[in-house]
């Protein structure tokens, strides 16, 4: 696999904290010196990472116009997690909270969902290999470092993985507009996986049928649905609220 670009202070700092050996080189805006950037640059230099100063136009071109905050790094790709890693992840959590994204192919939405997952303490985000956005620099930037901290598990057969986790005691709750009860009427404690579908299409049929329960977010206005990353945040933090109340 070829090296990857990550950009933005949050994303670079997250890799520094978790896996600094991945760094190949870094590019920084010429003349930029500020309190947020300097500690990151100092740590990169301490690690012996080559740092090149570049003009804003050169950085913009390298980041393909995305907001890079004056810092881009070239890193070795992280090891891609798969279904075989789930047992180890579950073993680290007494009552894991998981997030399943079925068909989220927009990198901005995936990045925002990863950021939500990190904030909510999600043990892992599970996606199908064939129906998910790849982990690009855009995803890492939108995720503000969460793409480097939240385990992203790509599985070959999502329904089969769900059934295997059900046998280990994980309860799967899917989100669907036609559900008969909403998230505030549902128990979201214990070993739980919240399943979100793609915007518009929702969950695929087999994913929906494999869920233990279906819930919806109550909508009071004229809009029929929320952006998937917004809906993801609403559901995850209702689960967090219930879990905190049960302590």
Curated annotation (Swiss-Prot):
Disulphide bridges: none
Keywords: Cytoplasm, Methyltransferase, rRNA processing, S-adenosyl-L-methionine, Transferase
Chief place where the protein resides: cytoplasm
Localization terms from the record: Cytoplasm
One GO molecular-function entry: rRNA (guanosine-2'-O-)-methyltransferase activity
SMART domains documented for this protein: SpoU_sub_bind
Enzyme Commission number(s) from the entry: 2.1.1.185
Pfam family for this entry, one: SpoU_methylase
GO cellular component, one term: cytosol
Positions of S-adenosyl-L-methionine binding: 197, 217, 226
Catalytic activity: guanosine(2251) in 23S rRNA + S-adenosyl-L-methionine = 2'-O-methylguanosine(2251) in 23S rRNA + S-adenosyl-L-homocysteine + H(+)
Family (UniProt): Belongs to the class IV-like SAM-binding methyltransferase superfamily. RNA methyltransferase TrmH family. RlmB subfamily.
Biological function: Specifically methylates the ribose of guanosine 2251 in 23S rRNA.
HAMAP family: 23SrRNA_methyltr_B
Name the record gives this protein: 23S rRNA (guanosine-2'-O-)-methyltransferase RlmB
Native source species: Vibrio cholerae serotype O1 (strain ATCC 39315 / El Tor Inaba N16961)
Gene responsible for this protein: rlmB
